[in-house]
Structures are given as structure tokens and as C-alpha cells.
């Protein structure tokens, strides 16, 4: 058995949740915040049998879309400084960050 931890953008989370549950995966959905963009993410915890890991990964890949987003960099002095005028920077966001972890034991009470 494996535990898949998948971090996706909030924009992709409802579609992914529906797809996973439609394919009979049990999913726990957590609201999280990314450290780089300081924006909302959704983290899914999915317990799966070893033979279903590849199917779960393909569904996550199909439903996590990469997109470009403009962000204003944070002041190098920490916080907003009046003399620092940041220029927006385009970064690629989205997709999914996925961890597949072994599960030694699983209990359901």
C-alpha cells in the first residue's frame, strides 16, 4: 500500500477531486498555502493499493494544469518598502507536486 500526497492549485482541486472519486479512490482534501507564491493550494492524501498507483498518478497529471501567472516580488528588505518598486515577474504555476510514500500499516476504526 502507498500514500500519495499531491499538491495542486486550488483552481484544479475540484476537478481532480471529482475525477479521483469517480474512479473509486478514497481522498482526503486539505487546504494548504504555498511558501513561494503565498497562495492557496490543495493537498490531497490518497491511500492506494500498489497496483493502482500508476492510475492515480495519471489522473493527477491529467487534471493539474500548468499556467503562467504574474507576481510582484517581495522586497529584499522584507515586507513592503516605500523605495522598492517591484516589477511583476511571470512564473509558471500549477501542475502537481506529488509524493508517493510507503505505508507500513493501515487501520480504519
Curated annotation (Swiss-Prot):
Listed PANTHER family: CYCLIC DI-AMP RECEPTOR A
Consequences of knocking out this gene: Not essential.
Binding partners and assembly: Homotrimer.
Span of the signal peptide: none
InterPro entries: CdAMP_rec (IPR010375), N-reg_PII-like_a/b (IPR011322), N-reg_PII/ATP_PRibTrfase_C (IPR015867)
Keyword Protein biosynthesis: no
Record keywords, A-Z: Cytoplasm
Pfam families named among the record's database cross-references: CdAMP_rec (PF06153)
UniProt protein name: Cyclic di-AMP receptor A
Domain notes: Binds three molecules of c-di-AMP, each in a pocket located between two subunits. c-di-AMP binding is accompanied by conformational changes of both the fold and the position of the B-loop.
Gene Ontology cellular component terms for the protein in this record: cytoplasm
Described purpose of this protein according to its UniProt entry: Binds cyclic di-AMP (c-di-AMP) and is probably involved in c-di-AMP-mediated signaling pathways. In vitro, can also bind cyclic GMP-AMP (3'3'-cGAMP), with lower affinity, but not c-di-GMP or 2'3'-cGAMP.
Highest taxon listed in the record's lineage: Bacteria
SUPFAM superfamilies on file: GlnB-like
Subcellular location: Cytoplasm
Ligand binding (3',3'-c-di-AMP): 21, 25, 28, 35-37, 41, 47, 92, 94
Gene3D superfamilies referenced in this protein's UniProt entry, alphabetically: 3.30.70.120
